A protein has these predicted regions:
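Propeptide-to-catalytic entry region of secreted or membrane-anchored zinc metalloproteases
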Residues: 20-119, 123-128, 222
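Extracytoplasmic/secreted proteins, especially bacterial periplasmic and envelope-associated proteins
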Residues: 65-68, 72, 161, 165, ...
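Catalytic zinc-binding patch centered on the HExxH motif and its immediate surroundings
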Residues: 110-111, 115, 127-148
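Short pre-active-site segment immediately N-terminal to the catalytic Zn-binding motif
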Residues: 148-167
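Catalytic Zn2+-binding segment of zinc metalloproteases
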Residues: 170-185
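N-terminal signal peptide c-region/cleavage motif recognized by signal peptidases
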Residues: 13-14
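Positively charged n-region of N-terminal signal peptides that target proteins for export
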Residues: 1-4
Length: 223
């Protein structure tokens, strides 16, 4: 259903943008349905998360690599009672070569053209931003002049320890905060390296409260 919606939007957008932009084409989709996303939390989940994942087929990003990282990142967020209910990777062909890079004006255009549900994760070749980050998250605090990017994560091919980087950036988005931790072993330390996996109860509370407030998380229904 979601893929059809995006495809329809792209067809409409292509007609309107034909004079100014090379058309985008949805090449394929790679769903991760609920039964392929076992919940790894020690306690019952309190909130549900859904993710739209965007990549271009002619980049380094392979679907298996992305989907494996998404599963592993979901296991890290489960310590906060957050259950990944659904994720789907949408791969595109066409468009301008610049769309494969994180660059504010071009990335704003990409989000407008693709219109993903949020939070959304974009897997790109590299960044044009200075200073340079291998991955970057956007919340309400850093998107006043670029509102299209709010609640998106951008992961470049230079990112190491991809599940950790993805979970770290998603936590920034869910908490709607750019703050880092100095606590040893914390997922929100500036460096995403093996061993930095824990989130404190306070961080979890902020992620679930802000995530629910911003419409990024849905509270679990009573069972």
């Amino acid at each position: 259903m979601r893929a059809l919606a995006i495809a329809c939007l792209l067809c409409c957008a292509s007609a309107g943008l034909a004079q100014s932009a090379a058309p985008l084409r949805l090449a394929d989709t790679w769903p991760l349905p609920e039964h392929e996303l076992p919940y790894a939390g020690a306690q019952p989940s309190t909130h549900r998360l859904q993710l739209d994942l965007i990549a271009f087929r002619d980049t380094q990003w392979e679907p298996d690599h992305i989907l494996r990282a998404v599963r592993d990142a979901a296991a890290l967020l489960a310590q906060c009672g957050i259950r990944l209910q659904r994720a789907e990777l949408y791969r595109f062909d066409g468009g301008e070569p610049s769309l494969r890079y994180l660059s504010t004006p071009v990335s704003r255009q990409l989000v407008r053209r693709v219109r993903p549900a949020k939070p959304a994760v974009f897997f790109v070749r590299d960044t044009r931003h200075v200073p340079t980050f291998d991955a970057e998250a956007f919340g309400t605090g850093n998107t006043a002049t670029r509102p299209e990017l709010v609640f998106t994560v951008w992961i470049t091919a230079a990112s190491r320890d991809l599940p950790l980087a993805l979970a770290h950036e998603l936590a920034h988005v869910l908490m709607d905060s750019g703050e880092h931790s100095i606590e040893p072993g914390n997922l929100m330390r500036e460096e995403t390296v093996p061993g930095n996996t824990r989130l404190t109860p306070e961080q979890c509370a902020r992620a679930t409260a802000a995530g629910e407030h911003n419409g990024l998380l849905q509270r679990e229904l009573p069972r």
